[in-house]
Amino acid sequence: AFHGRTMGALALTHKAAYREPFEPLPGGVEFIPAGDIEALRGALGPDVAALIVEPIQGEAGVRELPAGYLEAARELTEAVGALLIIDEVQSGMGRSGAWMAHHLLAPGVVPDVVTLAKGLGGGIPIGAVVATGEAAALLGPGQHGTTFGGNPVACAAALAVIDTVRSQDLLVRVEQLGSAWARELAAVDGVNEVRGRGLLIGVGLAEGLPPAGEIAATLLAERGFIVN
């Protein structure tokens, strides 16, 4: 899983290369295999505060959780009194063809918390934590804060993004473009798998070829694009 690079989020991120330069990190975190319901069942108990998952794992190669996993996660977390947190930082705000990727994968699941950033601001830095039900009452005024939280410019940008996605039917457009790209990519020599939803796409290449991201970055840089 990848949940961020600041200390709290980094503690929830599995990749050693990101973690090691900043260790020791906050503890009390257990990693389990994504999509493994039995592993989840074994890990959850009354001492667990929350489960955090990406509906489509970006850093892992654009791999979505299998059918039924989020439903099981919701049922199991409720049974032990743990929060279900869905990280939609990469997959949310329309990138998957829906406002949230979990709307596609598990339409009936309502998480306690959703985390958002990236596409929320349309290029302006902003992050948000959306909480529902009892989880929404866990933090009150003065308990936690950030210097630039509620920044009016960033919030105005987020409102403009939401309005644009709605007014221009961009969710439909994302689905159309994603389907077209997937078809075109699947026809390219050396491509053996196209994964993802909407415009959140991962490409698997035949053995012996460089990673797809490396090839794409080289071609984009040659054409004058800045690539991260």
Question: Which residue ranges define each predicted feature?
Answer:
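Conserved N-terminal phosphate-binding loop of PLP-dependent enzymes in the Aspartate aminotransferase
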Residues: 1-228
